[in-house]
Amino acid sequence: MNAFHPQYRLAVRNMTGIGSNLKDEMDTIYEDLSLEEIPWNLESPPDLLVELIESRRLLPCDAVDLGCGAGNYAVWLASEGFHVTGVDISSKALELARQLAGKRSVYCRFVTADLCGDVNSLQDSFDFAYDWEVLHHMFPENRGLYVANVARMLRPRARYLSVCFSEEDPGFGGKGKYRKTPLGTTLYFSSEQELRHLFEPLFEIEELCTVEIVGKYTPHMAVKVLLTKKQH
């Protein structure tokens, strides 16, 4: 099974300039493809996030969308009464996010930053963070730094929702931890156990399970983790 529609594969086949640098890769994708052609760009917010809010397990607060892309989920969350900051490595994606926020007449702050780099300007700023299909873009050697940065951005007892591709997902060849996509990017597919080990030093785990999530062309198997920052 391949997660990309045949017409989309034709579009990306002619792309050039995608290298090993994630910022360059993402800027190229957002420059060269329409939003309709970008596989992770979905307009409707994910059910797991909607359910968390509609059940009132999460109330409006200061929130950060990690790897916000073109801003769909950040703008939706702002419309639900949250004070939202969207962070992404791609300045091209954030240009689109700002346009969307203006079109929807909501305020979001958008910040260009490497989430494995310097996030001091965002320290102790948020009560809720989420990353949706972001962590599988990071290899194991960078994940500890990333999670430490997320914790640094959050206030004590803040909540954190992370959803990334599971090693049980049949897409992109269907096996192996590292899998190449038609875009030229490489993704890392996780197990529940390794995510438990990743998050436990800094977070209490509320929920950890494998779920099916909506994709643009086919569904995916993903690991959902809902966490609370430990109070040290």
Label the model's feature ranges.
Residues M1-D62, A70-L122, M138-N149, R159-H232:
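Class I (Rossmann-like) S-adenosyl-L-methionine-dependent methyltransferase catalytic domain
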Residues G67:
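Conserved S-adenosyl-L-methionine
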Residues Y130:
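A conserved beta-strand element that flanks and buttresses the S-adenosyl-L-methionine
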Residues E133-H137:
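Short catalytic micro-motifs in class I SAM-dependent methyltransferases
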Residues R152:
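Short, conserved loop/helix-junction motifs that constitute active-site signature segments
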